[in-house]
Amino acid sequence: MSIDAKLVKELREKTGAGMMDCKKALEESGGDMEKAITWLRQKGLAGAAKKASRVAAEGVVDSYIHFGNRIGVLVEVNCETDFVARNEDFKKLVQDIAKQIAACQSVEYVSIDQIPPEVVERERAIEMGKEDLASKPENVREKIVQGRIEKRLKELSLMDQPFIKDSSITVEELVKQHIAKLGENIRVRRFARFVLGEGIEKQEADFAAEVAAQAGLKPAQPAQVAEVAAAPPAEPVADQPAAEPPAESVAPEPVVAESADAEPAPAAEGKPSKKGSTKKKK
């Protein structure tokens, strides 16, 4: 429904809530002023805008390490007094904000107004160059691009993220609720998000070379490996007959001088004749 700007202004003057919060309250209540005030009080938004202009120089710097130690967050949240800084509700708020940052990969800035103009122009150039807009008329293209840029800027802004524990409110509304509850201005000043190994170019390790290096060996050169792989297999050697053992040496038979009329004595086969013995027939 359409909300009259005069009603929004009146509600703002009565509650001190922000213009957009007042408009949303009137939309939720159907334009009823009393119901809108009740809605703002239930959300903790009444009076938050007045406190938002006050200086917040106290606070805490807190950290959050996600399970597995792969994501870490540092965040600074300010309040007006050290009394509130020690309050358990304030500490819980800071811890919830740190967890929110850890869960949001795209978040880079606290709020949209902190995004540099060059980043906005870069996003605009990216959207204008997309092929699906090439055939659109110029005025239509501008509206589409503007809508996409606003969506993209909200993705970069922490305060515009839906709260991870209650998606019906944003982080900004969560902070405003605590401003109303604790009675002091609260401001998320800055944060840093760390991801293990982010920005490091990993090199593919040669597992064989790594093992060889640990063993103190030199890894085989690729050329040598290729040469060995290309070499034809050795031909099998034909079985050679076993060498016969050397024959037992046999002493030569002695030569016996015999007379002309003597008949030679028969020698036993395979045995040498007796050395130096000769007999004559009578």
UniProtKB/Swiss-Prot annotation:
Gene Ontology molecular functions: translation elongation factor activity
Chief place where the protein resides: cytoplasm
Positions of region (Involved in Mg(2+) ion dislocation from EF-Tu): 81-84
Keywords associated with the record: Cytoplasm, Elongation factor, Protein biosynthesis
Residue ranges of the region described as Disordered: 218-282
PANTHER family per UniProt: ELONGATION FACTOR TS, POLYPROTEIN OF EF-TS, CHLOROPLASTIC
Compositional bias (Low complexity): 218-270
Bias (Basic residues) ranges: 273-282
Biological source species: Synechococcus sp. (strain JA-3-3Ab) (Cyanobacteria bacterium Yellowstone A-Prime)
InterPro entries, A to Z: EF-Ts_dimer_sf, Transl_elong_EFTs/EF1B, Transl_elong_EFTs/EF1B_dimer, Transl_elong_Ts_CS, UBA-like_sf
Cellular component aspect of the GO annotation: cytoplasm
Cellular localization per UniProt: Cytoplasm
Task of the protein: Associates with the EF-Tu.GDP complex and induces the exchange of GDP to GTP. It remains bound to the aminoacyl-tRNA.EF-Tu.GTP complex up to the GTP hydrolysis stage on the ribosome.
Name recorded for this polypeptide: Elongation factor Ts
Superkingdom to which the source organism belongs: Bacteria
Family: Belongs to the EF-Ts family.
